[in-house]
Amino acid sequence: MVRAKRKLDHIEYALSTGQSRTHGFHDIDFVHQSLPNSSYDTITCETKIGELSLSSPIFINAMTGGGGEQTLHINEQLAYVAKHHNLAMAVGSQMAALKDESESASYKVVRKVNPNGIFFANLGSEATVEQAERAVDMIEANALQIHLNVIQELTMPEGDRDFTGVLQRIEKIVLKSKVPVIVKEVGFGMSKETVQQLANIGITAIDIGGQGGTNFAAVENERRQRMLSYFNNWGIQTATSIIEATSTNNNLSFIASGGIQTALDVAKAIALGANTTAFAGYFLRILMQDGVENLVDEIDLLHTDLKFIMTALGVKTIEELQSVPLVVKGETYHWLAQRGIDTAHYSRR
């Protein structure tokens, strides 16, 4: 019951705290093309994460599950949206269902609603190989997300305090997994050093989960008597984290998440090197406040606007969008300069 109550608390506080930090995309400017030589009608938005082919560079990221009927209903509606738009979708952490079989229905519902969809299972980095296999089987997943949430755990009153051996546990899962493994942050971003460590153990897809979206330090602080307020602004902004990650020059697929709300955010993230983008808090807020059909309509608009932007930039595919010229400025530029990452090549492509 404690875990289920926490799941419901997370939904409540995620909606009430909102996106309290900046994602950094205001520091990214496209170089305008007056002669784009492009047509809206010829644009395609297919992309890939590793060997997984996706019809859109937008997918529904992990949000919830394991909190009884309310989380079942949320996942049921999200799966309906995913089916309508043919989007990939991740479920929230499945540890609740591994501990209590009665909670498995709140995850299994996604496959029931969308039998042919692309779904990602989800567990924390404390998971064992056996737990990872069970999570994948539970929803017949196409991939497995392993989330890294050190700051959330430290801020969580009942959270973990020991993070030794995490990389070794992930490596064991990678070696045994029958589906691709995606490692993701939960709103605090990934550094180039972290990305390199993950690449070294065979990870081929990473969700950088940057600062700018749902602030899980703030969410957990709402549940504490004594707030750890020093964690509320902790992390690497999403735009910065994408550049850090891609600077490692590994042959990896990158997912950009963390405050993504608009088609312009999507376009900038892809132009910085992401293969796809993931929405969570923004979609959840629309679903809970305005209803499922409004979320369906919003995703329609996102795709329309993304195609408008691609037309303006003179590109026809997501791969071409990854090579358009842009300028990195402001705080993002200064951070990257201090980290020894040259951004000039973006503006000279």
Curated annotation (Swiss-Prot):
A GO MF label: isopentenyl-diphosphate delta-isomerase activity
Residues that hold substrate according to the record: 6-7, 152
InterPro entries: Aldolase_TIM (IPR013785), FMN-dep_DH (IPR000262), IPdP_isomerase (IPR011179)
Job description of the protein: Involved in the biosynthesis of isoprenoids. Catalyzes the 1,3-allylic rearrangement of the homoallylic substrate isopentenyl (IPP) to its allylic isomer, dimethylallyl diphosphate (DMAPP).
Cofactor annotation: FMN; NADPH; Mg(2+)
Organism: Bacillus mycoides (strain KBAB4) (Bacillus weihenstephanensis)
Signal sequence segment: none
Family of the protein in this entry: Belongs to the IPP isomerase type 2 family.
Location relative to the cell: Cytoplasm
Protein name: Isopentenyl-diphosphate delta-isomerase
Highest taxon in the source lineage: Bacteria
Cellular component terms per the entry's GO annotation: cytoplasm
